[in-house]
Amino acid sequence: MAMRQCAIYGKGGIGKSTTTQNLVAALAEMGKKVMIVGCDPKADSTRLILHSKAQNTIMEMAAEAGTVEDLELEDVLKAGYGGVKCVESGGPEPGVGCAGRGVITAINFLEEEGAYEDDLDFVFYDVLGDVVCGGFAMPIRENKAQEIYIVCSGEMMAMYAANNISKGIVKYANSGSVRLGGLICNSRNTDREDELIIALANKLGTQMIHFVPRDNVVQRAEIRRMTVIEYDPKAKQADEYRALARKVVDNKLLVIPNPITMDELEELLMEFGIMEVEDESIVGKTAEEV
C-alpha cells in the first residue's frame, strides 16, 4: 500500500489531538505503520502515544544544538504505542517569531533525513487550531498531505471553522492534489448533532466519515496519558475509534469542497433550531430594552 499522508484540522479545543491519537492507535492495532507529526507549538500531539507530558520538539532541539542541520533523525523521532513514530515540530516562545515556521522546518528536516521512506502506511499531521494560513497550511500548501479530515461538532464556531478550512483546501486543491476526506464529528452532545453535521457535510460536498460520541472514558485515559485503545481496549469508545480507523482506511471519497457563505451556515443552524431566526429589530437592544 502506498503511503497516505493525512492532515487533521479543526477549531482550537475541538479535540483534534485526542481524536488523532486514538485514530492512530486504532490503526497501529490493525497492524498499520504510522507516523504522527505534531504541527502545534504546544507539542501535545503525541503525549498519549508516548505517555509523556510533551515530547522534545525539533525547534527546541535545533536551538540547543545550534541549527537543525546538527540534529539526527533519532534525536527527534520517538516510537510509542504500537510502534507509532512520533515527532513534534514545536515553535518559538509565545509572542516571538512565527510558529508556522517550525512546521516548515520540521517537515523539511524529516524529508531530508529520510523519515518518510520507512515503509509507512500513514503519516498524520495534527495541525494547530483552524489556522489555514502561512506555515500551518504547509501540509496542504506544499502537497505534503493529500487527505484532509476536519474535526468538528454541532456548535456554531466549530462548523464555522470547518467551512473556513474548506476554503483553504479549495485554494490549494486547484494547484495540487490535496482533497477533503470528510468531517469527523467529535460530539459535544448538542441537539440533533449528527443530523446537523451530515447536513453540513452534504452542503460542502463531502461526508461525515464518523460520529464519535462523548464518553468520560476519554478523559480517564487522558489523565493517564493514554489513548482509550490502550487504556481500556474493551470500552465501547475504543470500538468507535476502531470504526473511524476502518473508515479512513477504506475511504475513497476525496473531494474539492464547496464552502458555503455565512448566510447559508446561519440558515442551516436556524433550520435545526440551533439559532433563532434573525430579527433585526432586536439588534443592539439591551435585556432591559427588549
From Swiss-Prot:
Single Gene Ontology BP annotation: nitrogen fixation
Enzyme Commission no: 1.18.6.1
Name of the top EC class for this enzyme: oxidoreductase
Post-translational modification comment from the UniProt entry: The reversible ADP-ribosylation of Arg-101 inactivates the nitrogenase reductase and regulates nitrogenase activity.
Binding-site positions, [4Fe-4S] cluster: 98, 133
Annotated phenotype, changing residue 16 to Q/P: Loss of nitrogen fixation
Regulation: Nitrogenase holoenzyme is subject to 'conformational protection' by FeSII; under oxidizing conditions FeSII binds to the holoenzyme and reversibly protects it from oxidation.
ADP-ribosylarginine carried by residues: 101
Domain of life: Bacteria
Induction of expression: Constitutively expressed during log and stationary phase in sucrose-limited cultures, its levels decrease during stationary phase (at protein level).
UniProt family annotation: Belongs to the NifH/BchL/ChlL family.
Protein's name according to its UniProt entry: Nitrogenase iron protein 1
Source organism: Azotobacter vinelandii
